[in-house]
Amino acid sequence: MALNLRKNHPLLKTINDALIDLPTPSNISAWWNFGSLLGICLITQIVTGLLLATHYTADTSLAFNSVAHMCRDVQFGWLIRNLHANGASFFFICIYFHIGRGFYYGSYLNKETWNIGVVLLLTLMATAFVGYVLPWGQMSFWGATVITNLFSAIPYIGQTLVEWAWGGFSVDNPTLTRFFALHFLLPFVIVGLTLVHLTFLHETGSNNPLGIPADCDKIPFHPYYSTKDILGFALMLILLVSLALFSPNLLGDPENFTPANPLATPPHIKPEWYFLFAYAILRSIPNKLGGVLALAASVLVLFLAPLLHKSKQRSLTFRPISQVLFWALVANLLILTWVGSQPVEHPFIIIGQLASLSYFTIILVLFPIAAVLENKMLKL
C-alpha cells in the first residue's frame, strides 16, 4: 500500500491534524469563523508591518517624516500603511467578536484555551499601543505619555518604573526606539501564543452552539469548514480593502497629522477606538491608582469567566435571562466606547461612572445570580 505522506510525515501530519482531518462539530455557525479571521489579520499585519519597517526610521527627528515619505514616495506605500493601520481595527473587531462568541456559548470552560486567549488579547493590546506611538504625531506622543504615566500610580516603585520604561525623564528618543523594537517583536510572540492556543483547543475540540458534546456527529474540517473560512476571508478582506481605499482616516485621529510637540497638549487626548471602553473605565474613577486598577480589571475580569459559571448548561442558547444580560453587557460596552471619546464634562462623567459600575456588576454579580435562577427554573 502506498505511503500516505499527509498522514505519516512528521510535519505534514501536524498540519493535517489541525487543518484537514480535524474532527469538527457539524453545527458550528459563522461565529466560529473569527478564529481563522484573526489568523488572516495576524498574517496581513506581519506582512504589511515588515514592508513598513523597511522604510521606517525609529528616531524622533525622522519618524514622522519617514512615514510621510512612505506614503508619498514608496511604491504603494500609502496602501501598505492604510492596510496596516486599518488592519489593526479589523484585528480588534474580530477579537472582540471572538471573545463575545466564547462568552455567549460557554467556550471559556476550555480553561487553558480561554486563559491563553486572554493573554493573547493583552499581548495584542500592548502591540497596538506601542505601534500607535511610532508615527510620532501629536496623539502618538501624548497617548504614550498619558498611558505610560499610569504606571507611576503603582506605590513605591511606580515613578522609577516609568522612568525605566521611558529611558529618561520623559517620552523621548529612547522611548521611541524601544517601542519600535517591541512592536517588531510582539507579533511573533502572538504567533507563538496562537500555536499554544490552537494546541489546547485541539485537545478538547471545538465547542458548538448547543454547548453539548458533539463527538457522535463530527465532520472533517476540510472541505467543509475550509470552504466556509475562505468565504469569511473574502468578506473581511473586501471590507478591509474598501476601508483602506475609500476612507483610510475614518478611524484615525486628525491630531496625528501634526508632528509630536511636547510643548503643546492636544485638547482631547484619547486612544484609538478599540481602547475607548477601557479608557472610559479608567477616567470614571477620580483616583489615579483606583483608575489604573479598574482599567486592569476591565480586561483581567475575563480570567474569572470559568469561575463565575454557575449554570448547569454550557451555552446561553436556552437561557433567556442570561441572554438579556449578555446583550445588556454588549450595549454597555458600546456606551463606554462612546463615552471614552467624549470630553470629561457633564453629563459624560456620570454616564461613564454608571456604565463602568454596571459593566462589573453584570459580569461579577448578575451573571452568576441569573445562572442560579435558571437552574431553579429547570426544576419547575
Curated annotation (Swiss-Prot):
Keywords: Electron transport, Heme, Iron, Membrane, Metal-binding, Mitochondrion, Mitochondrion inner membrane, Respiratory chain, Transmembrane, Transmembrane helix, Transport, Ubiquinone. Gene3D superfamilies: Cytochrome Bc1 Complex, Chain C. Heme b b562 binds at residues 84, 183. One of its GO terms (molecular function) is ubiquinol-cytochrome-c reductase activity. Binds 2 heme b groups non-covalently. Heme b b566 binds at residues 98, 197. The keyword Mitochondrion applies. One of its GO terms (cellular component) is respiratory chain complex III. The chain crosses the membrane at residues 34-54, 78-99, 114-134, 179-199, 227-247, 289-309, 321-341, 348-368. It is a multi-pass membrane protein. GO terms for biological process: mitochondrial electron transport, ubiquinol to cytochrome c. Its cofactor is heme b. Pfam families: Cytochrom_B_C, Cytochrome_B. CDD domains: cytochrome_b_C, Cytochrome_b_N. It comes from the Eukaryota. It is found in: Mitochondrion inner membrane. A ubiquinone binds at residue 202. PROSITE patterns: CYTB_CTER (PS51003), CYTB_NTER (PS51002). The cytochrome bc1 complex contains 11 subunits: 3 respiratory subunits (MT-CYB, CYC1 and UQCRFS1), 2 core proteins (UQCRC1 and UQCRC2) and 6 low-molecular weight proteins (UQCRH/QCR6, UQCRB/QCR7, UQCRQ/QCR8, UQCR10/QCR9, UQCR11/QCR10 and a cleavage product of UQCRFS1). This cytochrome bc1 complex then forms a dimer. Belongs to the cytochrome b family. Component of the ubiquinol-cytochrome c reductase complex (complex III or cytochrome b-c1 complex) that is part of the mitochondrial respiratory chain. The b-c1 complex mediates electron transfer from ubiquinol to cytochrome c. Contributes to the generation of a proton gradient across the mitochondrial membrane that is then used for ATP synthesis. PANTHER family: CYTOCHROME B (PTHR19271:SF16). Heme 1 (or BL or b562) is low-potential and absorbs at about 562 nm, and heme 2 (or BH or b566) is high-potential and absorbs at about 566 nm. This is Cytochrome b. It comes from Muscicapa striata (Spotted flycatcher). The lineage of its organism: Eukaryota, Metazoa, Chordata, Craniata, Vertebrata. The gene is MT-CYB.
